[in-house]
Amino acid sequence: MVLLFASCGQRYEAKQLVKAFVKEHATEEIDISSFSDLDSTKVISDSLLQVMRQQALKDTLFKDVKLGAIPQSTTLLYIRMRYGEDSLMQSRTFYFDKDLTGIIAFK
């Protein structure tokens, strides 16, 4: 039961980080329709993180992007944000360190 509350709290915290990021960096108004569950992965390499970070700087949906440092841990957390109209639904996946101190990459 405690684990369930911890994961709900982490999901809420991740959603708040993404909402704040969108509010601060979006180049247009983004209508967020939903978020996935918060999950973890160990398959994202440092080189893939670097590529995602470089691509994030070129993403025209966001401006003046500032990302957190790449963590030493091999475990990352991620959440998918869905936005847009039903016929044009799009998504971005945001990656965090395991302590949710900030967004470290997105795609």
Predicted segments, located by residue:
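Sec-dependent bacterial lipoprotein signal peptides
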Residues: M1-C8
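Cystatin/cathelin-like cysteine-protease inhibitor module
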Residues: C8-K107
